[in-house]
């Protein structure tokens, strides 16, 4: 996983749950992933 503070812009960048959630919380993410998709292996 990349650092959680890195920008999460594309769906393929969001396979690490905490990274995507952290980015979304800080309004840095527009990625639309399902909860099951968030846990897929990178």
Swiss-Prot record:
User: Which key words are in the record?
Assistant: Disulfide bond, Ion channel impairing toxin, Knottin, Neurotoxin, Secreted, Toxin, Voltage-gated sodium channel impairing toxin
Q: Which GO terms describe its cellular component?
A: extracellular region
Q: Which is one GO molecular function term here?
A: toxin activity
A Pfam short name: Atracotoxin
Q: Which family does it belong to?
A: Belongs to the neurotoxin 06 (delta-actx) family.
- Function, in words: Neurotoxin that slows the inactivation of vertebrate tetrodotoxin-sensitive voltage-gated sodium channels (Nav) and most likely insect sodium channels presumably by binding to site 3 of the channel. Effects are an increase in resting tension, a muscle fasciculation and a decrease in indirect twitch tension. It fails to affect tetrodotoxin-resistant sodium currents. In vivo, is lethal to both vertebrates and insects.
Task: Reproduce the free-text note on domains from the UniProt record.
Answer: The presence of a 'disulfide through disulfide knot' structurally defines this protein as a knottin.
Name by which UniProt lists this protein: Delta-actinopoditoxin-Mb1a
Q: What organism is listed for this UniProt entry?
A: Missulena bradleyi
């Amino acid at each position: 996983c990349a650092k959680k503070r890195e920008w999460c812009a594309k769906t393929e960048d969001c396979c690490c749950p905490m990274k995507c959630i952290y980015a979304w919380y800080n309004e840095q993410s527009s990625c639309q992933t399902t909860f099951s998709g968030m846990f897929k292996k990178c």
